[in-house]
Amino acid sequence: KESAAAKFERQHMDPSMSSASSSNYCNQMMQSRKMTQDRCKPVNTFVHESLADVQAVCFQKNVACKNGQSNCYQSNSAMHITDCRESGNSKYPNCVYKATQAEKHIIVACEGNPYVPVHFDASV
């Protein structure tokens, strides 16, 4: 079974790009990263930074998660991200996404040993 840490990497990490390459980026990535298999995942964020830099966030500013848990952390610096949001004409299995690029601080939930990101909570 896929670990929570591996799932985080599959769903949120794209260090090879500094930003979304094209308007088609989200459609391609959401499909290739298997987030459109049994439904269209409505919103997903990709982080264009090294895995080491994102894992380091687990040792940065401790903040409350949206669900009230206390194991979330905010990055000290802004990171290149792409938000993929399902567009109005999207209907499973033909999931259609709109990309929004930004430079924002990310908030991730961390757990385990080693202590690594397992959930993308927000960007601020």
UniProtKB/Swiss-Prot annotation:
GO biological process: defense response to Gram-positive bacterium
Subunit structure: Monomer. Interacts with and forms tight 1:1 complexes with RNH1. Dimerization of two such complexes may occur. Interaction with RNH1 inhibits this protein.
Gene3D superfamilies the record matches: Ribonuclease A-like domain
Active site, UniProt feature: H12 (proton acceptor), H119 (proton donor)
Cysteine pairs bridged by disulfides in the record: C26-C84, C40-C95, C58-C110, C65-C72
Organism per entry: Dama dama (Fallow deer)
Residue numbers binding substrate: K7, R10, K41, P42, V43, N44, T45, K66, R85
Protein name: Ribonuclease pancreatic
